Amino acid sequence: MNLRRLAAALSIVAAGLLVAAEFTTVFEVTVGSLEVVQRSATGGENHGYALLVVAVFAVVLTLLGLRGGGRAPGLALVALGAVVLVVALAVDLPDTRGSGRLPESLAYEDARARAGAALGLELVGGVLLVAAGGLLAAAGGGAPVGRRPASG
């Protein structure tokens, strides 16, 4: 398997993880020793479905990279992966940790937030996009997948 195909596979898996993360619980607020869930939010609700847009762009960039678009699609995938990691770490992670900032903490003394599966999906998806972009950039300006360079 050449670098471009490996990069494409990683990128498509990453895009799928990002789409799944948007519809999966990113955090839930529980109260009391019985762990009663007072509120929960999906990844999309928490950051405005931004990662759906990233996933679409990742697929488009992957297709461009497979067609031999040079290093630019790979570098753009690295940037998209970095954006995903910033959203996960700067937007979603604090919401999974800060019980004192929760509206429920005013009404319930023992309210606390905990991370859902979406945070992990976002982190893995972001790392995979960075890796895919690096591989695609390393593959660089060779012949597109499925075509052989002209001999002569």
Residue ranges and their predicted role:
Residues 1-152:
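Compact integral membrane and secretory-pathway proteins
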